[in-house]
Regions:
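Non-ligating segments of multi-cofactor redox enzymes
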Residues: 1-191
Length: 191
């Protein structure tokens, strides 16, 4: 199993928010140990769609930005908290929900703002890449819920050597979010 890559073609996004809603549906009230405790119902968006409107009626352009954990190869959280943040064999960055108890500072240490602090469980939390689904033998799709739920094919998800991932990256149309950070992320954007 290779490192997972997520490609997001935001030019295909129509703002339906299925990705954001499906993430909430998957994680609110559900415990996926050892990877995650339940996400709070409000205030946390491990997968977030932000809408930007430009222009005036009748000429309006809407842009939808998708943000979540970028699952960085050079993850500053792994470097700063090696006792409670680790990388899975899929290349996903995981905050251990037991060992990270009380470590609110992680919220401020992620340069992408992808970490939230659960004040009920007293733990930092973020996107897990739905590692629990990727490892579930009964989950046929073998992709995160955000990817599985998209009606407009915004996403391409697969191993770093998957031909469809390699072909799309080879076009040069995809880039990382804030490449100047130098963190070698596993999420790439087009548009």
């Amino acid at each position: 199993m290779g490192k997972k890559i997520l490609l997001i073609d935001i030019t295909r996004c129509n703002g339906c928010y299925s990705c954001q809603v499906s993430c909430k549906d998957e994680h609110v009230g559900n415990e996926w140990m050892p990877w995650a405790k339940p996400q709070p119902n409000t205030g946390h968006f491990w997968y977030r769609v932000t809408e930007t409107v430009q222009g005036q009626i009748p000429v309006v352009r809407v842009h939808y930005m998708h943000t979540m954990c970028q699952h960085c190869d050079n993850c500053p959280l792994i470097e700063k908290y090696p006792d409670c943040v680790y990388r899975t064999e899929e290349g996903l960055v995981i905050i251990d929900p037991v060992k990270s108890y009380g470590k609110m500072s992680m919220v401020y240490d992620c340069p992408y703002g992808a970490v939230f602090y659960n004040t009920t469980s007293m733990i930092p939390q973020k996107c897990t890449g739905c590692v629990h689904l990727l490892r579930d033998e009964t989950w046929i799709d073998k992709e995160p819920r955000c990817v599985q739920s998209c009606p407009t094919d915004v996403f391409t998800f697969g191993d770093e050597d998957d031909p469809k991932v390699v072909a799309k990256l080879a076009t040069g149309e995809y880039e990382t979010y804030h490449p100047e950070y130098g963190l070698k992320t596993h999420v790439f954007y087009k548009g």
